Amino acid sequence: MEEDTWIVQTTGLCKTYGDGAAVPALIDVSLSISSGKFLAICGPSGSGKSTLLNLIGTLDYPTSGQVIVDGVDINSLKGDRLADFRRAKIGFVFQLFNLVPALTALENVMLPLLPYQRGLSFKLEKRAQELLEGLGLRERLHHLPGQLSGGEQQRVAIARALINYPKLILADEPTGNLDSQSGEEIGRLLRHLNRDLGLSVLLVTHDANIAAYADQVVHLRDGRHVEQT
């Protein structure tokens, strides 16, 4: 397979925390994710799942090794260039939703791009509304997060992740705060984004039922890549 068909490649990836008694979080992790695929990362607590996602998402730098996202070596980007790349290429979905309590669902979805869309806010609002309606939230556009169920809040968070037309969705335990039925709905939704919209999805989960929606599953243990199924 040619290099330009990969959305993510990591080579010899290591991450160590602490200056004194250093704690290794990732040890020599190398993996490749094909563009347009859905990959789940599984493993026990402390296995390095979220650390790996943060490195791929450009939220942190590796201690050593290489991360390439959409053909770009992340280590070569700093400051505004890194932020611009992240905003253009990656959408994030978190376990705790991270919605602003005082903003409506519509405003939360618009928020990431508001500083960059001056004079075009009507187009941004139209895009946000279309996303929310497409996720079944037509009647919730002007509701505050506290007026929404957990599953509805996570769908708002997914719409927010899609607002910038990303190539890659990174979802860190997106069903961890949901009941099993809502969790399954989010799993199916992520699969829809991958299969029907062609987005690459990288999911961290401890739930085998949610991981089953992925094309492949990577297993981590003690910071090491131990298996891929």
Residue ranges and their predicted role:
Residues 6-220:
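ABC family nucleotide-binding domain
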Residues 217-229:
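H-loop (His-switch) and adjacent beta-strand-loop-beta switch element
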Residues 1-4:
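Short, low-complexity, intrinsically disordered N-terminal peptides in bacterial proteins
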